[in-house]
Curated annotation (Swiss-Prot):
Lineage, highest ranks first: Bacteria, Bacillati, Bacillota, Bacilli, Bacillales
Pfam families membership: Ribosom_S12_S23 (PF00164)
Protein name: Small ribosomal subunit protein uS12
Quaternary state and interactors: Part of the 30S ribosomal subunit. Contacts proteins S8 and S17. May interact with IF1 in the 30S initiation complex.
Family, per entry: Belongs to the universal ribosomal protein uS12 family.
GO cellular component, one term: small ribosomal subunit
InterPro entries cross-referenced by the UniProt entry: NA-bd_OB-fold (IPR012340), Ribosomal_uS12 (IPR006032), Ribosomal_uS12_bac (IPR005679)
């Protein structure tokens, strides 16, 4: 426990909170060609690479990912959720924050059903998370 005199001489240090998705906290001013501190919930970007990677132990799979160059000139790795996708190089995508626990370095998700990304086909439950339209009611 510090004395009052110690606190007067050297106050308490506040904890530094680090962002989980730092690329969303930067903007880009193309007129002066520099980054700005403008936060946004999602960002647009162009796929520079689409591929699969294997997760950490003890899981085993081929997880789909895309390397995305954002509008603020930062390049990030984003996870492609759902079964099947139509993304390839130069596809324009929307990313949101949210890491994938078993893929190191993947801190972002691609939003399905936005821009060039198609929704998941044949999905009936949790459709809003995968950009799937409501199926037409069957005729009797």
């Amino acid at each position: 426990m510090p004395t009052i005199n110690q606190l007067v001489r050297k106050g308490r240090k506040s904890k530094v909170v680090k962002s989980d998705s730092p690329a969303l906290n930067k903007g880009y001013n193309s007129f002066i060609k520099s980054q700005t501190n403008v936060s946004s919930p999602q960002k647009r970007g162009v796929c520079t690479r689409v591929g699969t990677m294997t997760p950490k132990k003890p899981n085993s799979a081929l997880r789909k990912y895309a390397r995305v160059r954002l509008t603020n000139q930062i390049e990030v790795t984003a996870y492609i959720p759902g079964i099947g996708h139509n993304l390839q190089e130069h596809s324009v995508v929307l990313i949101r924050g949210g890491r994938v626990k078993d893929l190191p370095g993947v801190r972002y998700h691609i939003v399905r059903g936005a821009l060039d990304t198609a929704g998941v086909d044949g999905r009936m439950q949790g459709r809003s998370k995968y950009g799937t339209k409501r199926p037409k009611a069957a005729k009797k």
